[in-house]
Amino acid sequence: MKKRILASTLLLIGLVISGCKAPVKEQEKISYDRPLPPGELALRKITNPAEIPDFTMACLDLAELRAAINNSLNYLRKPSSQQFYPLGEITHAQATQSLEAFAKLLDSGLAGAQLNQAIREKFDVYISIGCDDHGTVLFTGYYTPIFDGSFTRTERFQYPLYQQPDDLVKDSRGEIRGRRMSDGQIIPYPPRAVIEGAGMLQGKELAWLSDPFEVYIAHVQGSAKLKLPDGQLATVGYAANNGHEYKSVAQELVKDGRIPPDQISLAAMIDYFKKNRDQVSTYIRRNARFVFFKKEEGQPLGCLNEPVTAYRSIATDKSIFPRASLAFITTTLPRAVGGQPIKQLYSGFALDQDAGGAIRAPGRCDVYMGQGDLAGQLAGHTYQEGRLYYLFLK
């Protein structure tokens, strides 16, 4: 859903939670978005056994993991996936065989300490160098919102989601090249303010929502479920973007003093724009990135064009991390307890199945939290440092 997607920098800033380390104070000027230094790899093989994480607790909670692995294997078995490998020292065959071997371990019925031991014997473990070359990764969350919507414009539904325009050009890897002009020249695609202000996409409307900020949330998250007037649910997913960098509206609201930094959240933004609808356009146009959509069947899809799974799918920078591969994360994540987000220490296996407009560095990782309002709350409470590992067959 993301490269789709999103950036959960919409979401909470400065959580302080015992256990896993919370993000450092702003004055320390840590940059989670620090680019990968030239010539370096994002993953470093762990050679000291003492530095390999304990997988035991994660081996007791394997729900939905097997299905998520199958989704990654479906992708890796497509010939088109081979163009993205090798990545560093990781080959396409190694990524595929590693998932197949891990799936066999799951199918064997091993769990807990026994599965932990088998993993340590059969797999090498790599760690992301993070934002500081010491493994520090900022974990944020994203989700699939569910909005009332329509595929036809009505008095209630006035705010469109647009299809990919015919003049948008991608390369063979799906990267945005720009806009093809009538003479064949390719130029940068216009930013959001020009697209919206000039009505460039008239006739390319895909669906309509009732609230302009809900449209923007769909842009940030990269997909949405629409509850249609007849009660049916439809999915609209990411098709492309205009090639511009993402800029956080949340940070703009804080900078302008509209919402205090210790109160910024998706819920606070929704509340602010409901009370100040005349400001929605002003703020969202500060983010030059514009997302185009397409109809999808079934569950929301990640950038691999495979379904994403709550807590089992992560979004990373696909230019530096091996897509579809098996990952392991240790951090603090919120879980739903009694219908409310409760933050807990977390370690779990995940699959690298998505990408995000704001997730462009070895120090960033976005965790998919599911669908609907509660998932949105969980995503909004996800802003925490941790460690990101990858597992490959020895």
Tell me the role of every PLM-derived stretch.
Residues 21-24:
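Bacterial signal peptide processing site
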Residues 16-19:
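C-terminal motif of bacterial Sec signal peptides marking the signal peptidase cleavage site
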Residues 1-7:
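Bacterial N-terminal signal peptides that target proteins for export
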Residues 28-30:
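N-terminal basic/disordered segments at the start of proteins
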Residues 296-394:
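C-terminal soluble interaction/assembly domains
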Residues 42-306:
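Secretory/export targeting leaders with adjacent low-complexity proregions
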